[in-house]
Amino acid sequence: MRKKIVVGNWKMNKNVAEGVALASSILENLDGGKMACEVGIAPAYPVLSEVGRVIEGSDICLVAQNCHYEDEGAYTGEVSVRMLDSLGCSYIIVGHSERRQYFGETNRTVNLRLKKALEGGMRVILCIGETLEEREAGVTDAIVTAQVREGLADIEDLGNVVLAYEPVWAIGTGKTATPEQADAVHASIRATISDMYGEADAEDIRIQYGGSVKPSNAVELFGMPNIDGGLIGGASLKADDFVAIVNAAG
């Protein structure tokens, strides 16, 4: 059975003091970080180090929101996998829809980031998902399949890869895919993985759902057969809400 994974993506929220306070509250309310599911939190870059100190020794993973695909060099504003490793990160998110929408990331550059993260010994959360226009045009499966195939190009081992399906139209909007809608896309993603890697890998890979997950809908979403936890945005900024979502997965 796949172990569920819940990751709080803080995005560009919380300074150091606020991040430390939030992480401390999450840790306290999760009984010192002992959970039935896997849990991670992804602060902004400047907050990673201090939050890492808070959760050190617990089972909560430190997660980075992105990485560059080069080891070092003249890439102003970018952060390398080696730097993130030195801060204690164990997961890196790549391909989040906001990175694709606002910063021009493509399936190709997402694939480069994913490769570099895996080469650096990291586990990776690969984000995929369609816009409202694409869903209404009936091309959800085609878009998501292309993102999976191109994002995982030349990747032979999926052991350190988690997928996160995040319908762009449901992120931060209050709209949520119904559990049945989300599970149908997750099933389609598994079919793509089966075609690429075989049935065993398709059964083993974990696929999170992201998009306005909150305590009131988490139990139903996480109860679907193909949904293996969540990539949580806004609700991860309140300790009580995030802990309730974690408990829904446990």
Swiss-Prot record:
What CDD domains does the entry give? Answer: TIM (cd00311)
Enzyme Commission identifier(s)? 5.3.1.1
Q: What class of enzyme is it?
A: isomerase
Pathway it belongs to? Carbohydrate biosynthesis; gluconeogenesis; Carbohydrate degradation; glycolysis; D-glyceraldehyde 3-phosphate from glycerone phosphate: step 1/1
Q: Which SUPFAM superfamilies has this protein been placed in?
A: Triosephosphate isomerase (TIM)
Q: What does this protein do?
A: Involved in the gluconeogenesis. Catalyzes stereospecifically the conversion of dihydroxyacetone phosphate (DHAP) to D-glyceraldehyde-3-phosphate (G3P).
How is this protein named in the record? Triosephosphate isomerase
Q: Which organism is it from?
A: Chlorobium phaeobacteroides (strain BS1)
Organismal lineage: Bacteria, Pseudomonadati, Chlorobiota, Chlorobiia, Chlorobiales
